[in-house]
């Protein structure tokens, strides 16, 4: 699944909320702190990690790619 952004980057916790895989920022913080999230195949423990187009995020059986929205600067 692809997640489109209109800005230069999106923070990891915001992406997890944006794809509705977590219900809140607190829940995002917990799954990240527990080492359940991988960015580009590497466990990521920073909820503020900046994600750019081309980055891949995985949580359990869910995987998301970050891409620039059409027409975004």
List each model region and its residues.
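A basic, amphipathic helix-loop patch mediating RNA/tRNA/ribosome contacts
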Residues: 7-53
């Amino acid at each position: 699944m692809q997640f489109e952004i209109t800005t230069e980057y999106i923070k990891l916790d915001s992406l997890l909320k944006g794809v509705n895989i977590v219900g809140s920022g607190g829940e995002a913080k917990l799954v990240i702190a527990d080492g359940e999230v991988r960015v580009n195949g590497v466990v990521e423990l920073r909820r503020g990690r900046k994600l750019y187009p081309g980055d891949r995020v995985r949580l359990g059986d869910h995987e998301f790619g970050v891409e620039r929205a059409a027409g975004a600067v």
